[in-house]
Amino acid sequence: MADLIRSSLKVTALPAYLLACMALLLAVPARAQWSGSVDLSGGLGGIEGGIASDNKPVFHGLAQGEFRLNYKTDKFSWNTTLNGKWEPNTTDNTRISYKKERLGIIYKSASTRPLTVSLKSEFAWKPAADRNYSSWILYQYKNDRGQNHSLNYDGKENDSEKLSYNYEVPVLNEHKVETGLKTYRSFDSGRSILQSSLTFQAINSKKVTTWIVFKSENNKEGSGTAIDVDDLKGYAWKYRITPNSLDLNLDGDIHLQRTVLDDATKLKYAPGFRFSSKHALDENSGATRINVTLEDVEEAWRDSTRLRESFNYLSILAEPYLTADFKWNKLEAHLDYACQLYARRLNDETHRQPLKIKGVYPVGKSNIKWTISPRHSLNLTNQLSVAHPDYLKICWYDRTAGYLDQLYRGNEQLLSPFTQRSGLEYELTLNRFSARTSVTYTHVSNEIDQTWTNEEIDGRQYKVFHWMNSSNSDALGITQKLGWKGKVITANVAITYNQTRRASTRTDAVKNSIDWRLNADITARLGRGWSIGSDLKYQSKMKTFYTVLSEYGELNAQIQKDFKKFSLYLRGRHLLDQTVTTSFESEELQEYWVEEVRNNRRIVMIGVKWKF
């Protein structure tokens, strides 16, 4: 029997591991039947190559093969997969400049040849319809020995010449072993599900990482515990109970980080609590979620300029949510809004910033759909994100410590955006023809500037931070999609136009951009599982950026970028995952700086990929 299997696989020698597995199969009772087969797949994944106008050749290749062996009985199954992948890449970049009798040459070349081989065996045992157990073992090997070349020449600078050459051979040699056990149990006709898993994984490379994960699932809600042993050591745990109408989640995290260079140690402890409830009323349903996270962080460090110091702070984050779905005749509505409240207290007399408070107004989205008829529908969408207009930070200010002004002024840059996005979509569906038109408008306002006020509260001097609006943007988008689905031919066309204007009130900088894209695809079914098709993509994007001097009102600088990309793909495909694809890509970028051409680059790529 072993000779028959060896001749059918057309191999002359098999690893001892596979021979032992086949001997085990021959020893099973006669009632065990093969269900499945020995599968061999792979081939040359593809070759892509091209060259740019700045003499930058690019090469990308992929070769991948896979061997699968499957065995199955009524209550037992075994799958073994051997996979190999080789993916060489080469990128060269050469730039030559000449200005005022000064010659400059920059040459860089990088190549990688990563090889990955993995062997995985999976075992599954199903003693009953509502229970099963599974286990697996995985071995994976990665090797990458690349090359990096760099040459720099800078001549006749102060009557001197500079020449440097660098050669580097990065090496990656990694072994990975993973094993685990899973259990599955369903109760009450599948309404309640309990699933747990235990995973152990070890990686041996330049960095060693080992962790254990325990996962328990109920109604597809998961939790886990992880141990990560490396330069960064951490422990995390989660426990979640999820009946049909209640979601109770407790989680936590402990992080211990040790830095040898500056003898710094950081300890982070962050427990959390989340609660949510769900209810249903006829066809309408809603949910309320409240997330509360408590974070206690302790840090201690020592460097060359100061003695060892330590501090800790407590953070509280509360996020009440409201979600609801409504249906009435031909109208459907969905609401999902939240409100975030954040506060942090820093217990440290050195930094003098005991309290920080931030409130966030409702954040969420709504969607209203009106089905006029089976062929016509209107969809109105709205997204809203409103941050608190004032980020309040109260600090105890000591007049004898004048350095606090400089420390605080350059310490933080926070964003507090306001975002409003509204859209209207019309959809028409006929027998084989469909059309969809959508218009969206987006307004974004960012608050990144800061102002300071000194206030005296209860006999103490406080510094209060105020954040003000500094930039805003408006965008208009129009999309038109057309589709045809016939018995033989399927075609889709999409045209998208976007125009954005972004302005800053602090620097008087304005950026305008126009982006329009064309995507088209057509597929013809030839029968017997074969189909041929073509994909066409074109993108044109122009950006103009300029600043105005506030004092004089004159144009200071202007930059214009013009980007174009064209792609054409021809593909043949079979239902049994046999694919052949040829591609042609062209990419062009032109950059102007006040009428002067600074960069003009063009890349042309031609590639062939096939898979069986």
Where are the model-predicted features located?
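Membrane-proximal, glycine/serine-rich, low-complexity loop/turn segments characteristic
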Residues: 5, 30-206, 255-271, 325, ...
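Bacterial N-terminal signal peptides
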Residues: 15-26
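Outer membrane beta-barrel strand-and-loop segments of large Gram-negative receptors
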Residues: 251, 411, 415, 434-494, ...
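Face-selective signature of the C-terminal outer-membrane beta-barrel domain
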Residues: 124-138, 170-348, 365, 371-379, ...
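Extracellular loop and loop/strand-boundary signature of outer-membrane beta-barrel proteins
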Residues: 51-55, 102-109, 163-169, 182-184, ...
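C-terminal extracellular loops and terminal segments
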Residues: 77-78, 468-479, 490-556
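Surface-exposed loop/turn segments flanking beta-strands in extracellular/periplasmic regions
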Residues: 90-104, 153-163, 215-236, 281-308, ...
